[in-house]
C-alpha cells in the first residue's frame, strides 16, 4: 500500500492535528476516519458518505437529543409550560435554527471550499472560545444568509 500525498490528505492531517490540539474529538475522529478511508481500499465508499453522511449524522444527532426524553431524564412540561414566553421564544429559536441549517446544506454542496473555512472557524471557536463543535450546518446557513443565498 502506498500513501497518496495530496492536498486533501494534507488538509485532513492538519485537521487531525488541530482536532487533537483543541481537544475536539469530533474533528479528530472525522479527519482520521476520512484520512484512513482516502488512503485505503475504503476510498470506494467515500461517495456513499458524501451522499448520505449528513442525513445519517442528523438522524444520529436527533436520536441523541431525543433519548433523554425517552429515558425519562427530561419530562415534558404540562400545558401551562407550553404557553410561557420562554417556551414560545425557545420554539421560535428552534424554528429559526432549523431553517438556517436547512439553508446551509445546499450552500455546502454548491461551494464545498467554504466547508473548510467553516471547519477552521469551528475549530478556532472550540479551541479558544470554549465553544462546542455542533454548528457547521447552522454556520453554513448563517453564511448563506450573509451571502444573500436566502
Swiss-Prot record:
Keyword rRNA-binding: no
Keyword Cell membrane: yes
Key words of the record: Cell membrane, Membrane, Transmembrane, Transmembrane helix
Sequence intervals crossing the membrane: 1-21, 52-72, 81-101, 123-143
Topology versus the membrane: Multi-pass membrane protein
Places the protein is found: Cell membrane
GO cellular component, one term: plasma membrane
Family to which this protein belongs: Belongs to the UPF0756 family.
Name this polypeptide is given: UPF0756 membrane protein CGSHiEE_06715
Organism lineage: Bacteria, Pseudomonadati, Pseudomonadota, Gammaproteobacteria, Pasteurellales
